[in-house]
Amino acid sequence: MHTLAAVVVLQVCWAAVLWPCPPTHSSPVDCREEQAGSSQCPTISQEKLLDRVIQHTELIYRVSEESCSMFEDMFVPFPVRLQRNQAGNTCITKDFPIPTSKNELQQISDTWLLHSVLMLVQSWIEPLVYLQTTLDRYDDVPDVLLNKTKWMSEKLISLEQGVVVLIRKMLDGAILNSSYNEYSAVQLDVQPEVLESILRDYNVLCCFKKDAHKIETILKLLKCRQIDKYNCALY
């Protein structure tokens, strides 16, 4: 009962975070005070929760694209961009045991799809926090870019909570007892030279954008399976 109660509370809190503006109609999770202790208190369905997680991820990916492009235009000369593209994958998540092709993704279970999403989300929480501290040292970084990185960092934590609830619901109250923050390879104890810092921050933004898109793809595949499992082979 304690586990179920914790899940319900997390569902309610996470659903509230997803609404950036006060809703004009009653909340989908409407537990009145007199109902709070009742087993009949409604909770958000797995299907609706998955939809919100996907919407959340779409927004994060869109803002990551905008942030990466803005940083690139302001601080990264074209030859440096080209050099990075030729260097290949230098992202902190490159060695994660996550399928990279659609054919590989088709072979893994729904639970492992969510587990892969959680792995990616947790690995980026600390790097995005650190990115904010490094951008604060720039003399001419616009407030809009700072606000975008702060927004992504906050929403990533919200996304983590939503994915945890989804996994619990799919595993009937259980949760995979793992944390992947240890994969974060950000060095917090050194202050690099200006160019090195720019290149590192650029790499962080580009890699996060790439992984945000991967998270979105995995979640949409999961959604497709929920609707019609046998027609997602070409997703």
UniProtKB/Swiss-Prot annotation:
The keyword Cell membrane does not apply. SUPFAM superfamilies: 4-helical cytokines. Glycans are attached at residue 147. Pituitary gland. GO terms for molecular function: growth hormone activity; growth hormone receptor binding. Disulfide bonds join 31-41, 91-207, 224-232. Transmembrane segments: none annotated. Keywords: Disulfide bond, Glycoprotein, Hormone, Secreted, Signal. This is Somatolactin. A smaller variant of SL is probably not glycosylated. InterPro entries: 4_helix_cytokine-like_core (IPR009079), Somatotropin/Prolactin (IPR001400), Somatotropin_CS (IPR018116). Pfam families: Hormone_1 (PF00103). It is found in: Secreted. GO terms for cellular component: extracellular space. The keyword Disulfide bond applies. Gene3D superfamilies: 1.20.1250.10. Belongs to the somatotropin/prolactin family. Residues 1-26 form the signal peptide. GO terms for biological process: animal organ development; growth hormone receptor signaling pathway; positive regulation of growth; positive regulation of receptor signaling pathway via JAK-STAT; response to nutrient levels.
